[in-house]
Amino acid sequence: MPVARNGTIIPIDDQPISAGFFGEGQWLTDFVTPNALEVKTLYKDICKGKQTRRERVVGMHQFVGAAIKYRPFIGATMTVAGKTSRNPDAWLPPSITRMVGIGNCANKAFLLASLLRNEFSPKEVHVVLGNLYNGKAGGHAWCQLQMDDRSYIIESTRADVPTFISTDTTERYEAVHFFNDIDAYAIAGRTAMEPYLACYSTWLKDYLDMSYIRGRR
């Protein structure tokens, strides 16, 4: 179960997302992929020779923060048999992010959470979607880890910050959603949950698969 500094965490339906190409729908939990071949190989490479969990977590954070270049938006194009789909802010599978070496905050958090899930249980690792207050509020994604009876924020966009940032002492990060490859949660009252075929979050409106939500598929 994730941890929130303020607010009540509630379980929610998996969210239908369309953030790739050709309007393809995917579930929110599909973006954390601990069993992908590239993720498993990368996990083994990063953790080789590291004796403690703490060392391995630092290694994973350092890799994603430094080796995967950060850009606020990732424009991507897919062409299949002459048909082309363009997405100005694509959510990519962790394996693709690893291979291309570039990602937005969400893509980097998906990859880091997928790596961490090779070390920790679903109860201990979540991607967090929320707001970062840095002069003004902006949407952001990061990871949360429960380890040694403490909860930590792990900032996946940067390697030049401490790996372990205590959830209890950080006010700049405001969580709205938590998820991994198994389940999804929200902070009660921070998003409107609208019931259609699925009970969807209006906070995610820019990435939702509205065709599915409105029953057109």
Task: Give, region by region, the residue ranges found by the protein language model.
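A structural boundary/capping signal
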Residues: M1-R217
